Design a protein with these regions (language model features):
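C-terminal substrate-binding/catalytic lobe of Rossmann-fold NAD(P)-dependent oxidoreductases
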Residues: 4-7, 12-42, 53-55, 120-225
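Anion (oxyanion) recognition and catalysis
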Residues: 22, 65, 86
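Glycine/charged-rich beta-loop-alpha catalytic/anionic-binding loops adjacent to active sites
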Residues: 45, 87-95, 178-185
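N-terminal Rossmann-like NAD(P) cofactor-binding module of classical short-chain dehydrogenase/reductase
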Residues: 48-49, 72
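Rossmann-fold NAD(P)-binding glycine/threonine-rich loop
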Residues: 55, 62, 75-95, 100-112
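Amphipathic, non-transmembrane alpha-helical secondary structure
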Residues: 58, 62-66, 106, 110-113, ...
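A short helix->loop->beta-strand "cap" motif at the edges of active sites that frequently abuts
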Residues: 67-70, 88-90
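A charged, well-structured terminal subsegment
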Residues: 111-122
Length: 225
């Protein structure tokens, strides 16, 4: 059965997900660009992929929920309004990063923190680097990693440094520094294809759900089972 996908935010991520979807036999029924006038009730879509700006992501998602459509949100920087999404009683998937590698980095970082906090000489820090068109700084992925480390028991503040350079897809490093050595856990995205494949996997996974608000942890845990 051919699934019908609507994309809000037809930029780099939106186009990458569209390519994967079409290659998998889906059809794209709507491509919403900046300043377009749109109504999700007119799309005849099965699901929506949202990848725009932090200030518009929640309102876009709420419009789709009101139209009865499940939504995958790839935009970051809007999580201060998460309660609005949760209270809307729709079917939503969101992630600060759709890379499976980043999810593994987060899990390893949690374990690493539990070990490293036993040694008071080590101080954690996070470094992230992205392309110059990246809108939020530090990245949502870096902020998520910081929360994971803090929750896992880090006793010292976690400093985050962010930089923007041309043609950098995405680099994240968790560093543990002491006076005698440095331990670095690093993830570098080589292309956007990994994000797009993860985004498409999230679309497929969410289609099986009736309602709820889900994250990468939910999807990966479900796949593990």
């Amino acid at each position: 059965m051919q699934m019908k996908l609507a994309i809000i935010g037809y930029g780099k991520m939106g186009k990458a997900v569209a390519k994967v979807a079409v290659d998998k036999g889906w059809s794209i029924v709507a491509k919403v660009r900046k300043d377009d006038v749109w109504d999700p009730k007119e799309w005849d879509a099965d699901i929506v992929f949202e990848s725009t700006r932090p200030e518009s992501a929640v309102d876009n998602a709420l419009r789709c929920i009101d139209a009865g459509l499940p939504v995958v949100i790839a935009t970051t920087g809007w999580h201060n309004r998460l309660s609005e999404i949760e209270n809307a009683q729709g079917c939503v998937f969101y992630a600060t990063n759709f890379s499976i590698g980043i999810h593994l980095l987060n899990n390893i970082s949690q374990y690493m923190t539990q070990v490293m906090t036993q040694f008071s000489d080590y101080t954690p820090s996070i470094k992230e680097e992205h392309h110059t068109q990246k809108l939020d700084s530090p990245s949502g992925t870096a902020l998520t990693l910081s929360r994971i480390i803090t929750t896992a028991g880090a006793k010292k503040p976690v400093a985050i440094s962010a930089s923007r350079k041309n043609d950098v897809v995405g680099i994240h490093e968790l560093c543990w520094d002491s006076k005698v050595d440095q331990l670095i856990l690093r993830h570098e995205a080589i292309s956007r294809e990994g994000f797009a494949l993860g985004g498409f996997q999230a679309l497929n996974w969410l289609l099986e759900k009736e309602s709820g608000v889900f994250t990468m942890n939910d999807m990966i845990s479900n796949l593990d089972n």
